[in-house]
Amino acid sequence: MSLEIQSKAVVVDDDLVYLQTVGLMLKKLGFQDIKLFSNPIDALSYIETIQIDLIVSDWDMPLMTGCEFLEKIRKNPKTNSVPFILNTGNRSEAYWRQAITAGVTEFLFKPFSYSVFKDSVFIAIDLARYDRRHHNSISKLAC
């Protein structure tokens, strides 16, 4: 199964091997426009200029953690509903609890397989679509 729409994704990781690997996996899934960033500061600047369909980010990065990046994404009305997959090699329960509190859509532990990544991408996109439909339904009821 692959995406059949012009899907845009942003990938952020200071580990260039993971950055390239995740980019290739997204391409295989059908994403048409994939932008790779080695730090979240540059990614935030880019995200301000375009509508995107998915963000995949590492947690442990210099300048700003992936969770801090997620918090900034969720605070921005333009990006607060974008599916966000956060990944880390740290298996601390505190990490995933903090990510859930910040509004993560999916959480992956490194290393992960293509199959696990693929499932996470489709789950994240489906959850975001459901949330948007649910929000729109509630908005219509309120009118």
Give residue spans per PLM region.
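Acidic, metal-coordinating helix/loop segments flanking the phosphotransfer/catalytic sites
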Residues: 36-54
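CheY-like receiver
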Residues: 126-143
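Two-component/phosphorelay signaling modules centered on CheY-like receiver
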Residues: 16-35
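Acidic catalytic/metal-coordinating carboxylates
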Residues: 38-39, 65-71
